[in-house]
Amino acid sequence: MNPPRLPPAILIMGPTASGKTAVAMALADRFPVELISVDSAQVFIDMDVGTAKPDRATLDRYPHRLIDLITPEESYSAARFRADALTAMAEITAAGKVPVLVGGTMMYYRALLHGLADLPQADAELRAEIDAEAAAEGWPAMHAKLALVDPATAARLHPTDSQRLQRALEICRLTGRPMSELLAESEKQKPPYDLLQIGLLPSDRAVLHQRIARRFDEMLLAGLDEEVRQLRQKYELNLNLPSMRCVGYRQTWEMQEGLIPKREWRDRGVFATRQLAKRQITWLTNSFAAENYDCLDPALVERIAARTEAFLSS
Protein backbone atom coordinates (compact mmCIF):
# COMPACT_ATOMS: atom_id res chain seq x y z
CA MET A 1 0.00 0.00 0.00
CA ASN A 2 1.44 3.36 -1.02
CA PRO A 3 1.87 6.00 1.71
CA PRO A 4 -0.49 8.98 1.48
CA ARG A 5 0.75 11.84 -0.67
CA LEU A 6 2.21 14.80 1.15
CA PRO A 7 0.32 18.07 0.65
CA PRO A 8 1.45 19.92 -2.49
CA ALA A 9 3.37 23.18 -2.58
CA ILE A 10 4.87 25.11 -5.48
CA LEU A 11 8.07 27.16 -5.56
CA ILE A 12 8.58 29.78 -8.28
CA MET A 13 12.24 30.82 -8.28
CA GLY A 14 14.23 33.05 -10.58
CA PRO A 15 16.37 36.16 -10.93
CA THR A 16 15.06 39.68 -10.63
CA ALA A 17 12.92 40.83 -13.59
CA SER A 18 12.25 37.26 -14.74
CA GLY A 19 8.47 37.54 -14.36
CA LYS A 20 8.01 35.44 -11.21
CA THR A 21 5.18 37.52 -9.78
CA ALA A 22 3.25 37.53 -13.06
CA VAL A 23 3.45 33.73 -13.20
CA ALA A 24 2.33 33.41 -9.58
CA MET A 25 -0.65 35.70 -10.13
CA ALA A 26 -1.63 33.76 -13.24
CA LEU A 27 -1.64 30.56 -11.18
CA ALA A 28 -3.76 32.30 -8.54
CA ASP A 29 -6.32 33.09 -11.27
CA ARG A 30 -6.58 29.41 -12.23
CA PHE A 31 -5.96 27.29 -9.15
CA PRO A 32 -6.86 27.29 -5.43
CA VAL A 33 -3.53 28.71 -4.27
CA GLU A 34 -2.25 31.38 -1.91
CA LEU A 35 0.99 33.30 -2.40
CA ILE A 36 3.95 33.58 -0.03
CA SER A 37 6.67 36.12 -0.78
CA VAL A 38 10.28 34.91 -0.73
CA ASP A 39 11.97 38.29 -0.92
CA SER A 40 14.40 39.65 1.66
CA ALA A 41 13.70 43.25 0.58
CA GLN A 42 9.90 43.12 0.55
CA VAL A 43 9.78 42.22 4.26
CA PHE A 44 10.48 45.90 5.02
CA ILE A 45 7.62 48.30 5.70
CA ASP A 46 7.67 51.54 3.66
CA MET A 47 10.15 50.14 1.13
CA ASP A 48 7.86 49.83 -1.87
CA VAL A 49 9.31 51.49 -4.97
CA GLY A 50 12.84 50.08 -4.86
CA THR A 51 11.71 46.56 -3.95
CA ALA A 52 9.18 46.32 -6.82
CA LYS A 53 6.59 45.44 -4.20
CA PRO A 54 3.14 44.80 -5.72
CA ASP A 55 0.90 47.84 -5.31
CA ARG A 56 -2.10 47.90 -2.98
CA ALA A 57 -4.63 47.07 -5.70
CA THR A 58 -2.57 44.04 -6.73
CA LEU A 59 -2.15 42.88 -3.14
CA ASP A 60 -5.88 43.25 -2.55
CA ARG A 61 -6.54 40.93 -5.48
CA TYR A 62 -3.55 38.63 -4.91
CA PRO A 63 -2.65 38.68 -1.20
CA HIS A 64 1.00 37.88 -0.45
CA ARG A 65 2.12 36.61 2.92
CA LEU A 66 5.49 37.66 4.41
CA ILE A 67 5.42 41.19 2.99
CA ASP A 68 5.72 44.28 5.24
CA LEU A 69 6.84 42.41 8.35
CA ILE A 70 9.46 44.69 9.94
CA THR A 71 10.76 48.27 9.84
CA PRO A 72 13.90 49.16 7.87
CA GLU A 73 15.73 49.52 11.19
CA GLU A 74 15.33 45.80 11.90
CA SER A 75 16.85 42.59 10.55
CA TYR A 76 15.13 39.47 9.24
CA SER A 77 17.04 36.19 9.09
CA ALA A 78 16.80 33.09 6.94
CA ALA A 79 15.93 31.16 10.11
CA ARG A 80 12.99 33.45 10.82
CA PHE A 81 11.87 33.17 7.20
CA ARG A 82 11.87 29.38 7.43
CA ALA A 83 9.75 29.42 10.57
CA ASP A 84 7.34 32.02 9.16
CA ALA A 85 7.07 30.26 5.80
CA LEU A 86 6.37 26.85 7.35
CA THR A 87 3.67 28.41 9.54
CA ALA A 88 2.08 30.12 6.54
CA MET A 89 2.26 26.94 4.46
CA ALA A 90 0.55 24.95 7.21
CA GLU A 91 -2.24 27.54 7.50
CA ILE A 92 -2.79 27.63 3.74
CA THR A 93 -2.86 23.84 3.52
CA ALA A 94 -5.31 23.63 6.43
CA ALA A 95 -7.59 26.01 4.53
CA GLY A 96 -7.66 23.60 1.59
CA LYS A 97 -5.39 25.66 -0.65
CA VAL A 98 -1.93 25.15 -2.14
CA PRO A 99 0.99 27.33 -1.01
CA VAL A 100 2.84 29.04 -3.87
CA LEU A 101 6.14 30.54 -2.77
CA VAL A 102 7.44 33.21 -5.13
CA GLY A 103 10.57 35.33 -5.03
CA GLY A 104 14.26 35.53 -5.69
CA THR A 105 15.98 35.27 -2.31
CA MET A 106 17.77 31.99 -2.84
CA MET A 107 19.16 31.83 0.71
CA TYR A 108 15.58 31.72 1.98
CA TYR A 109 14.69 28.87 -0.38
CA ARG A 110 17.77 26.97 0.74
CA ALA A 111 16.82 27.45 4.39
CA LEU A 112 13.29 26.23 3.70
CA LEU A 113 14.36 23.16 1.75
CA HIS A 114 17.39 22.07 3.74
CA GLY A 115 17.11 23.61 7.17
CA LEU A 116 19.79 25.67 8.87
CA ALA A 117 22.94 24.95 10.77
CA ASP A 118 23.09 25.90 14.43
CA LEU A 119 24.91 29.16 13.77
CA PRO A 120 25.61 31.79 16.44
CA GLN A 121 23.47 34.88 16.79
CA ALA A 122 24.75 38.12 15.34
CA ASP A 123 27.26 39.97 17.52
CA ALA A 124 26.88 43.73 17.06
CA GLU A 125 30.29 44.56 18.52
CA LEU A 126 32.11 42.05 16.34
CA ARG A 127 30.19 43.18 13.25
CA ALA A 128 31.26 46.75 13.96
CA GLU A 129 34.89 45.58 14.17
CA ILE A 130 34.58 43.76 10.84
CA ASP A 131 32.94 46.79 9.22
CA ALA A 132 35.77 49.00 10.53
CA GLU A 133 38.35 46.63 9.05
CA ALA A 134 36.49 46.66 5.75
CA ALA A 135 36.31 50.45 5.75
CA ALA A 136 40.09 50.60 6.18
CA GLU A 137 41.10 47.73 3.89
CA GLY A 138 38.18 47.17 1.50
CA TRP A 139 35.85 44.18 1.15
CA PRO A 140 38.10 42.38 -1.37
CA ALA A 141 40.77 42.29 1.36
CA MET A 142 38.19 40.86 3.78
CA HIS A 143 37.32 38.27 1.13
CA ALA A 144 41.01 37.29 1.03
CA LYS A 145 41.01 36.93 4.82
CA LEU A 146 37.96 34.69 4.64
CA ALA A 147 39.65 32.55 1.98
CA LEU A 148 42.43 31.75 4.46
CA VAL A 149 40.06 30.36 7.10
CA ASP A 150 37.05 29.24 5.05
CA PRO A 151 38.05 28.73 1.41
CA ALA A 152 34.81 26.91 0.55
CA THR A 153 32.62 29.84 1.58
CA ALA A 154 34.98 32.39 0.04
CA ALA A 155 34.84 30.53 -3.27
CA ARG A 156 31.08 31.04 -3.57
CA LEU A 157 30.99 34.67 -2.41
CA HIS A 158 31.77 37.70 -4.55
CA PRO A 159 34.61 39.82 -3.12
CA THR A 160 32.23 42.77 -2.68
CA ASP A 161 29.29 40.84 -1.18
CA SER A 162 29.72 42.70 2.09
CA GLN A 163 26.70 41.32 3.92
CA ARG A 164 27.58 37.66 3.43
CA LEU A 165 31.31 38.22 3.88
CA GLN A 166 30.62 39.95 7.18
CA ARG A 167 28.46 37.05 8.37
CA ALA A 168 30.97 34.38 7.31
CA LEU A 169 33.84 36.18 9.07
CA GLU A 170 31.68 36.77 12.13
CA ILE A 171 30.87 33.05 12.40
CA CYS A 172 34.51 32.05 11.99
CA ARG A 173 35.62 34.46 14.69
CA LEU A 174 32.82 33.57 17.10
CA THR A 175 33.11 29.79 16.76
CA GLY A 176 36.67 29.25 15.60
CA ARG A 177 35.27 27.09 12.80
CA PRO A 178 34.48 27.81 9.14
CA MET A 179 30.85 28.44 8.28
CA SER A 180 31.03 25.88 5.47
CA GLU A 181 31.92 23.18 8.00
CA LEU A 182 29.02 24.12 10.27
CA LEU A 183 26.62 24.14 7.33
CA ALA A 184 27.83 20.71 6.21
CA GLU A 185 27.01 19.34 9.64
CA SER A 186 23.46 20.65 9.55
CA GLU A 187 20.98 17.86 9.17
CA LYS A 188 18.82 18.02 6.09
CA GLN A 189 15.34 19.09 7.14
CA LYS A 190 13.00 18.70 4.20
CA PRO A 191 9.64 20.42 4.65
CA PRO A 192 6.68 17.99 4.81
CA TYR A 193 5.36 18.81 1.33
CA ASP A 194 5.32 17.37 -2.16
CA LEU A 195 7.21 20.16 -3.88
CA LEU A 196 7.10 21.37 -7.45
CA GLN A 197 10.16 23.56 -7.92
CA ILE A 198 9.90 25.87 -10.94
CA GLY A 199 12.90 27.88 -12.07
CA LEU A 200 12.71 30.84 -14.45
CA LEU A 201 15.95 31.34 -16.39
CA PRO A 202 16.65 33.59 -19.40
CA SER A 203 17.62 32.05 -22.73
CA ASP A 204 19.24 35.39 -23.55
CA ARG A 205 20.93 37.31 -20.72
CA ALA A 206 20.99 40.48 -22.82
CA VAL A 207 17.19 40.56 -22.89
CA LEU A 208 17.04 40.08 -19.11
CA HIS A 209 19.51 42.96 -18.76
CA GLN A 210 17.20 45.13 -20.86
CA ARG A 211 14.31 44.24 -18.56
CA ILE A 212 16.43 45.11 -15.53
CA ALA A 213 17.36 48.51 -16.97
CA ARG A 214 13.76 49.26 -17.90
CA ARG A 215 12.50 48.31 -14.45
CA PHE A 216 15.14 50.40 -12.69
CA ASP A 217 14.18 53.37 -14.86
CA GLU A 218 10.56 52.82 -13.83
CA MET A 219 11.64 52.89 -10.18
CA LEU A 220 13.38 56.22 -10.72
CA LEU A 221 10.26 57.65 -12.34
CA ALA A 222 8.12 56.25 -9.50
CA GLY A 223 10.14 58.18 -6.93
CA LEU A 224 12.95 56.00 -5.57
CA ASP A 225 14.97 59.10 -4.64
CA GLU A 226 12.10 60.55 -2.61
CA GLU A 227 11.31 57.17 -1.02
CA VAL A 228 14.86 56.91 0.33
CA ARG A 229 14.73 60.50 1.61
CA GLN A 230 11.49 59.77 3.46
CA LEU A 231 12.91 56.56 4.92
CA ARG A 232 15.94 58.45 6.23
CA GLN A 233 13.69 61.06 7.84
CA LYS A 234 11.37 58.51 9.45
CA TYR A 235 13.87 55.91 10.68
CA GLU A 236 17.35 55.75 12.22
CA LEU A 237 19.18 54.21 9.28
CA ASN A 238 22.73 53.64 8.12
CA LEU A 239 24.36 51.92 5.18
CA ASN A 240 25.28 48.84 7.24
CA LEU A 241 21.65 47.88 7.84
CA PRO A 242 20.29 45.06 5.64
CA SER A 243 17.51 47.36 4.40
CA MET A 244 19.92 49.95 3.06
CA ARG A 245 22.16 47.29 1.55
CA CYS A 246 19.34 46.36 -0.81
CA VAL A 247 20.08 47.01 -4.46
CA GLY A 248 18.89 50.45 -5.49
CA TYR A 249 18.69 51.78 -1.94
CA ARG A 250 22.46 51.71 -1.38
CA GLN A 251 23.15 53.50 -4.67
CA THR A 252 20.46 56.09 -3.96
CA TRP A 253 21.82 56.74 -0.46
CA GLU A 254 25.34 57.15 -1.88
CA MET A 255 24.04 59.58 -4.50
CA GLN A 256 22.20 61.61 -1.86
CA GLU A 257 25.36 61.80 0.26
CA GLY A 258 27.48 62.86 -2.70
CA LEU A 259 29.51 59.65 -2.54
CA ILE A 260 28.76 59.02 -6.21
CA PRO A 261 27.89 61.60 -8.89
CA LYS A 262 24.20 61.87 -9.68
CA ARG A 263 24.97 61.19 -13.35
CA GLU A 264 26.30 57.73 -12.34
CA TRP A 265 23.41 56.86 -10.01
CA ARG A 266 21.20 55.16 -12.58
CA ASP A 267 24.00 53.16 -14.22
CA ARG A 268 25.34 51.97 -10.86
CA GLY A 269 21.90 50.86 -9.81
CA VAL A 270 21.39 48.94 -13.04
CA PHE A 271 24.83 47.34 -12.77
CA ALA A 272 24.22 46.27 -9.16
CA THR A 273 20.88 44.75 -10.17
CA ARG A 274 22.53 42.84 -13.00
CA GLN A 275 25.11 41.48 -10.55
CA LEU A 276 22.29 40.40 -8.23
CA ALA A 277 20.59 38.59 -11.11
CA LYS A 278 23.86 36.85 -11.97
CA ARG A 279 24.19 35.56 -8.39
CA GLN A 280 20.55 34.44 -8.36
CA ILE A 281 21.03 32.52 -11.61
CA THR A 282 24.16 30.83 -10.22
CA TRP A 283 22.28 29.78 -7.07
CA LEU A 284 19.32 28.50 -9.05
CA THR A 285 21.50 26.58 -11.49
CA ASN A 286 23.77 24.97 -8.90
CA SER A 287 21.73 24.54 -5.73
CA PHE A 288 18.16 23.53 -6.59
CA ALA A 289 16.44 20.61 -8.31
CA ALA A 290 14.11 22.90 -10.21
CA GLU A 291 12.31 22.32 -13.49
CA ASN A 292 13.63 25.27 -15.46
CA TYR A 293 11.64 27.31 -17.97
CA ASP A 294 12.75 30.07 -20.30
CA CYS A 295 11.45 33.24 -18.68
CA LEU A 296 11.49 34.94 -22.10
CA ASP A 297 9.16 32.37 -23.69
CA PRO A 298 5.88 34.06 -24.78
CA ALA A 299 4.06 30.84 -23.79
CA LEU A 300 5.69 30.74 -20.33
CA VAL A 301 2.48 31.17 -18.33
CA GLU A 302 0.61 28.53 -20.32
CA ARG A 303 3.45 26.03 -19.98
CA ILE A 304 3.70 26.48 -16.22
CA ALA A 305 -0.08 26.41 -15.81
CA ALA A 306 -0.21 23.09 -17.68
CA ARG A 307 2.60 21.69 -15.52
CA THR A 308 0.83 22.90 -12.38
CA GLU A 309 -2.45 21.28 -13.42
CA ALA A 310 -0.66 17.97 -14.02
CA PHE A 311 1.16 18.26 -10.68
CA LEU A 312 -1.97 19.01 -8.67
CA SER A 313 -4.01 16.26 -10.33
CA SER A 314 -1.35 13.54 -10.03
UniProtKB/Swiss-Prot annotation:
Molecular function terms, GO-annotated: ATP binding; tRNA dimethylallyltransferase activity
Sites where the protein binds substrate: 16-21
Chain residue ranges for the region called Interaction with substrate tRNA: 39-42, 163-167, 245-250
Marked site (Interaction with substrate tRNA) residue numbers: 105, 127
InterPro entries: Dimethylallyltransferase, IPT, P-loop_NTPase
The keyword Lipid metabolism belongs to this UniProt entry's keyword annotation: no
Database matches in Gene3D superfamilies: 1.10.20.140, P-loop containing nucleotide triphosphate hydrolases
Top EC category: transferase
The keyword Signal is annotated on this UniProt entry: no
Keywords: ATP-binding, Magnesium, Nucleotide-binding, Transferase, tRNA processing
Any one GO biological process: tRNA modification
EC numbers, comma separated: 2.5.1.75
Short name of any one Pfam family annotated for the protein: IPPT
Lineage: superkingdom: Bacteria
Cofactor requirements of the protein: Mg(2+)
Family under the similarity heading: Belongs to the IPP transferase family.
NCBIfam families: miaA
Subunit composition and interactions: Monomer.
Name this polypeptide is given: tRNA dimethylallyltransferase
Originating organism: Dechloromonas aromatica (strain RCB)
Gene: miaA
